[in-house]
Amino acid sequence: MQCIKFLLVAVGCILSFSSYSQQGHASVSGVIKDSDGQPVPGAVVVLKNTHQGTQTSADGAYKLDNLAPGNYILLISSIGYTGDSVALTLRENQQLVYNSALASDHGGLDVVTVTGKTEQEKIKESGFSVNSIDVTRLANTTADLNQVLNRTSGVRVREQGGVGSDFNFSINGLSGKQVRVFVDGIPLDVFGSAMSLNNVPVNLAERIDVYKGVVPVNLGADAMGGAVNMITNQKIKRYLDASYSYGSFNTHRAAFTGQYTHEKTGIVLRSSFFYNYSDNNYMMRNNPDYDVEIRTVENGQFVNKDSRRFHDRYQSGMGQIELGVMNKKWADVLFVGFSSSFYTQQLQTGFRQDNVIGNNTKKGESFTGTLRYRKDNIVKGLNFNAFVSRSRDRYDITDTSFVKYYWDGNSMPSAVTELLNNEKTITDISRPRTFGRVNLSYELNPNHSFNLNYTLDHTRNHNYNRLTADEDDIPGLLQKHVGGLAYQQELLKKRLTNTFFGKFYGLNLEQKHWVSSEGGYVKQKDFVTNYGYGIATRLRILRDLGIRASYEYTYRLQETEELFGNGINVIGNPNLKPESSNNINVGAFYGIKNEKHKLFIEVGGFYRDAKDFIFALADVRSSQMIYENKSNVRITGVEGEIKYNYKTLISFILNATYQRAINTTKFTGPESSVPEATYMKRIPNQPWFFSNAELNIGKDNLLGRNTRIQLNWYSQYIHWFYLNWENFGYVGGKSDVPTQLIHSASLTYSIKKGTYNISLECRNIMDAFAYDNYRLQKPGRSFSVKLRYFIK
């Protein structure tokens, strides 16, 4: 059946290949500056009476390519400047350069009104279901990337505590390892376990693209649930961005990123650093209404009362340097890089907060070397992109105390350790990793293009108890091969876009198994291959109205933690199988804008039919969990988002998501006739309705020339959901996570066109009870201040 589906997609791809002429196409590019010679970012550049348009980058640069030869009128517009227009004649294969200097509009002169599209708008209007977030507008806030993404439709980030805590990331109901995270198309975890969405500051990103369910070939991953791709700033030749923030619970955050380009030689130096520290000593509040009891000991008696967290300190840091060249005949990009990261994390609880921990600490470090290369137009229309890295990620967990702690810090002797082991352990986990990615893209003509991608991910897993062994005698091996081929066509004068693709998944696995006849562990090798395929299409009905649909049959291969465990609270499962899913997205979008107003409305529906669904099964008697396969899980849902901007004064965002994830496994086993007790019941510990609202009000030059003051308000609503299976227990005693409504706000003042910035922020203004993954309590009201310096 799978082969037939794959052949149908391939045949459709071949039949839809129209024989358009391969006429040479032209381009026009340049830089837009003001009368003082400073770049004008965000200027709209379009070709009159066409759909071709863009906005200038942070350094004022723009480019319009894939243009047919002919006569055009180029229109340039930016708020606060007089417009510019020029007649152009483009010849076949011509690469025209047109630079413009815009004069300030002090007298309210008539401005040419044009409507180009930003990079975010272009991505959102593609055939894929994707959210594209402009992170630069949040650079002055103290948010990390998790908090930014948690305000996006279809996305839920469930944290286990404060800064640096473990979290579960979900897109349209699929979560955890089913969602892949990238930075500039490279898996984020290549750079070590200290690199995570919950500790990377917003300053390090320019844009974030969130792909839902159906993932393009060029990312090259087994991302069954979707993917997050963080795009860094690579357009500005020289810049420096440095920030520091201090907040409640003794929280410190520092970040630095910059780039220097030597004009004559083309040598480029890039660097990024960040550091996070927090005591995370927020108050744990007793709430018996929801079976959340904070148990302490007073005079030999158990007493439930509010207590402060006492063993949750977290610190992490990362440094990265890249040196290379750009815009050479033999390389458009060539960089050699090195990065190092570390973290120290005290453990305060297991996955349930009544399991209090007071001695265990997790420490880790990683070192990564990278090489990246890109060359466009090796031959006409053929682009080559390659990345390779070698890294070593290591961490250890100490669990040697036979005690049980309570929330006031008191402890009592116990028969087991804090992580419920029967013996003392210092677990040492080391994972040497080699990662490689090669991408070829070929543009046959402006309407037909191909993309070929291949990734190799080779990871060793060394896991042993330092108190009883010197090394892992039988280390595990996880080697992934993911390949993909895509063909994209644009028809009906680019009103219709179709992308057909196929993917290959190969898994080479080596792990130890206990064999009684051998009297010990032996190495077992397995190699499994699977194939996926899909299509994404977008039809623009009107200039501002379009519909889209996408489908993918995809696989997600097992991860090292799921197979080998993490040494803390995850038990390895060597019998775990890959999971697969049929993913469908449908949606529509409508967007209009002029020089004052901008409105974008988006609605969509999604369907996920997962087989061998990998599910984290928690043991209610302990603090441990194990990943297992559920035969069938079906997820359906709808989502919508509205965005409105009035000039640079006001912007408003409102989104909501409803999803239903149910277990569709009828019987307890493949050969069993015993009914599954949870058949057609909701998957537990997953929110099913949530909504976000954001209001931003800002004014330029209110407190002086080249200044801006801005107020941001955020609200988030999460409807209650079951912690365990909904049909277990009696009606009055079902365990659930309560409904929550959380408000946060920030105030930012910027001077000298954003060179100097100061922000004040308050999260959870109403000090409401906040719960998340497995009903773990999150911080209450908190305050912070951030200083940021940016120059280019």
Residue spans of the language-model regions?
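Membrane-embedded beta-barrel scaffold of Gram-negative outer-membrane proteins
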Residues: 548-552, 556, 579-636, 657, ...
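C-terminal beta-signal and adjacent terminal beta-strands/loops
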Residues: 4, 606-612, 713-792
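Short, acidic, small-residue-rich periplasmic hinge/interaction motif at the N-terminus
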Residues: 33-38, 43-48, 77-81, 91, ...
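Extracytoplasmic beta-strand/coil segments of soluble accessory domains associated
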Residues: 130, 146-187
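Face-selective signature of the C-terminal outer-membrane beta-barrel domain
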Residues: 320-343, 362-552, 596-605, 653-655
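A beta-strand signature from Gram-negative outer-membrane beta-barrel systems
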Residues: 202-241
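Gram-negative outer-membrane beta-barrel transporters
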Residues: 601, 605-609, 628-722
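Short acidic/polar hinge/loop motifs at secondary-structure boundaries
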Residues: 65-66, 186-213
